Amino acid sequence: MVCKCDCKNQNCSCNTGTKDCDCSDAKCCEQYCCPTASEKKCCKSGCAGGCKCANCECAQAAH
């Protein structure tokens, strides 16, 4: 299982204590999303439309 980053705590939800979590914007789309596809920056979580930022590598359109 891939370790998912918890950006709020900057820890992995499946942290085994042997590896740091990558909490960069690109790895933390659950925390950074944009209301529209035209947005060029990452926004705070809770907005509609899911992650559409150029610097966010999202596996899902929304969560």
Swiss-Prot record:
GO molecular function annotations of the record: cadmium ion binding; zinc ion binding
A Gene Ontology biological process noted in the UniProt record is:
response to heat
Name what induces it.
By cadmium.
Keywords, A to Z? Cadmium, Metal-binding, Metal-thiolate cluster
- Metal-binding is among the record's keywords: yes
Cysteines joined through disulfide linkages: none
Organism superkingdom: Eukaryota
The record's function comment reads: This protein binds cations of several transition elements.
Per the entry's comment, what about the domains?
All cysteine residues are arranged in C-X-C groups. These are thought to be the metal-binding sites in other metallothioneins.
Family that this chain belongs to: Belongs to the metallothionein superfamily. Type 6 family.
Protein name in UniProt: Metallothionein-2
Say which species the protein is native to. Caenorhabditis elegans
Q: Which gene encodes it?
A: mtl-2
